[in-house]
Swiss-Prot record:
Subcellular location(s) of the protein: Cytoplasm
Stored InterPro entries: DsrEFH-like (IPR027396), Sulphur_relay_DsrE/F-like (IPR003787), Sulphur_relay_TusC (IPR037450), Sulphur_relay_TusC/DsrF (IPR017462)
Organism: Pectobacterium carotovorum subsp. carotovorum (strain PC1)
Keyword Cell inner membrane: no
Stated role: Part of a sulfur-relay system required for 2-thiolation of 5-methylaminomethyl-2-thiouridine (mnm(5)s(2)U) at tRNA wobble positions.
One GO location term (cellular component): cytoplasm
Any Pfam family: DsrE
Subunit comment: Heterohexamer, formed by a dimer of trimers. The hexameric TusBCD complex contains 2 copies each of TusB, TusC and TusD. The TusBCD complex interacts with TusE.
Keyword line: Cytoplasm, tRNA processing
Major location (coarse): cytoplasm
GO biological process per UniProt: tRNA processing
Family listed: Belongs to the DsrF/TusC family.
Gene from which the chain derives: tusC
Protein name: Protein TusC
Length: 119
């Protein structure tokens, strides 16, 4: 079966890429069981708890990340260096259970997927 990776690289709410990526992720989950979800750069901000997008008149789609385990999507990886570069604690209570990886391990894990979709 084909392994598909979704890579989130943009901050939430500034554009629609995070929401569109999440929609695509849920749609593809009906077609394949081997899905990996990767967060790097500003994409790590997608998983911050207690966001208030309504303050900037945006839809709150972040809570939808919490349903990924219901779709049997549990391979989620966060770049530890990206977290630290943004001044965030690695002990943050992310909205999704993620495995923090050093950049080399993160890239190695990503390389094991057949298709990579970036948002």
């Amino acid at each position: 079966m084909k392994r598909v990776a979704f890579v989130f690289t943009h901050a939430p709410h500034g554009n629609a890429s995070g929401r569109e990526g999440l929609d695509a992720l849920l749609a593809v989950s009906a077609l394949t069981e081997e899905i990996g979800v990767f967060f790097v750069g500003d994409g790590v901000l997608q998983l911050l708890p207690q966001q208030q997008p309504d303050q900037i008149l945006m839809r709150n789609y972040i809570a939808t990340f919490g349903v990924l385990p219901l779709y049997d999507i549990d391979c989620c990886y966060l770049c530890e260096t990206s977290v630290r570069q943004r001044g965030l604690s690695i002990d943050t209570n992310w909205v999704l259970d993620v495995e923090l990886l050093a950049p080399e391990a993160w890239r190695s894990k990503l390389a094991s997927y057949h298709s990579i979709l970036s948002f």
